[in-house]
């Protein structure tokens, strides 16, 4: 009788445990690099197999540099009002496949009338670069030849210890300057 009671108690406890634990396990972990579902579907359709760069994709030194400046933010995703219209806009660094090789691509996604517009801006090569935003302002290229006066936040696409490129919306198109080379 004692064995049967113990078996029923253990079985009930296990069932209750599974009922509470299973939903927590079934939910995906949020690492700050997750995309809205509808955008994820659009990215998957346009770039099959692509994914957003995360901290694990960075070289050890690059991860330290990024975390020093941006904490636990996602290195492959930044939300900003790039176009100045207040509509959802994200800059993404995607890891894509080019044959057997990994490649990276910077894209800007902009939600207009419940549809995401995806605009490729640049490629970054096989070693994962990062992206972040900067406030509106005056920016001069590394050579001192070109100046951008941004009225909206800008995008910085960077491969630490190699290069950094700034992208600003001019109202008519995207202006690009090298801020580190």
Region locations from a protein language model:
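Bacterial N-terminal signal peptides
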Residues: 10-20
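Transition segment at domain starts
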Residues: 47-64
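Secreted/periplasmic proteins that engage bacterial cell-wall peptidoglycan
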Residues: 62-89
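Acidic, small-residue rich beta-repeat scaffolds with periodic aromatic anchors
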Residues: 6, 19-52, 116, 122-181
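Structural motif
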Residues: 99-108, 162-166
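Acidic/hydrophobic-patterned starts of short beta strands in beta-sheet-rich repeat architectures
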Residues: 77, 84-94, 146-156
């Amino acid at each position: 009788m004692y064995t049967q009671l113990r078996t029923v108690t253990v079985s009930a406890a296990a069932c209750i445990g599974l009922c509470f634990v299973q939903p927590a396990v079934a939910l995906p972990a949020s690492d700050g690099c997750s995309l809205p579902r509808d955008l994820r579907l659009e990215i998957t359709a346009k770039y099959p197999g692509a994914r957003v760069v995360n901290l694990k994709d960075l070289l050890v030194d690059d991860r330290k540099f990024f975390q020093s400046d941006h904490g636990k933010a996602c290195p492959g995703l930044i939300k900003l009002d790039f176009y100045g219209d207040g509509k959802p806009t994200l800059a993404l660094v995607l890891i894509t496949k080019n044959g057997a090789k990994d490649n990276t691509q910077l894209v800007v996604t902009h939600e207009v009338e419940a549809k995401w517009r995806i605009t490729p801006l640049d490629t970054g090569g096989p070693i994962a670069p990062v992206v972040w935003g900067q406030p509106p302002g005056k920016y001069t290229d590394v050579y001192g030849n070109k100046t951008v006066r941004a009225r909206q936040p800008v995008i910085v696409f960077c491969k630490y210890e190699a290069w950094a490129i700034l992208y600003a919306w001019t109202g008519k198109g995207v202006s690009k300057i090298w801020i580190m080379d």
